[in-house]
Amino acid sequence: DLILVDSTDPIGPGEGLFTTEFYQNCFNILSDNGILVNQSESPYYDQFSHEMKRAHKKIKNIFPISKVYQFHMPTYPSGHWLFGFASKKLDPIKDVDFDKWNALGIKTKYYNPQLHVGCFALPSYVQEMLDNE
């Protein structure tokens, strides 16, 4: 199973989707092989990076596997945005089966196995923010 949280910013109506209680509820309803993906703001601006660090800290205190990955979206502030990946058992790099993916023969304009691995390699300043929270 999969929970995708493509929420608004953690201010106002979207605030409830960034709470420890919400993440704990996600953990409770996911199977052992389930995955939670949440939008985690941008590391570039102080206000956004503060929320990114808070969300990651809450999630990593609940889920045994908690990672952050990045993508670039020119229409978002700074263009550099992050997502969280959380699971009880599945690691987004160690447990992915690229042979199975390649056997599907799906042609994409953006996604490929190298990008999948690379998006989890964070810039030093982002990794330091997450490590120091």
What is each PLM-predicted segment?
Residues 10-18:
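Glycine/threonine-rich flexible loop motifs
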Residues 14, 40-56:
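Conserved class I S-adenosyl-L-methionine
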Residues 78-133:
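SAM/dcSAM-binding transferase cores
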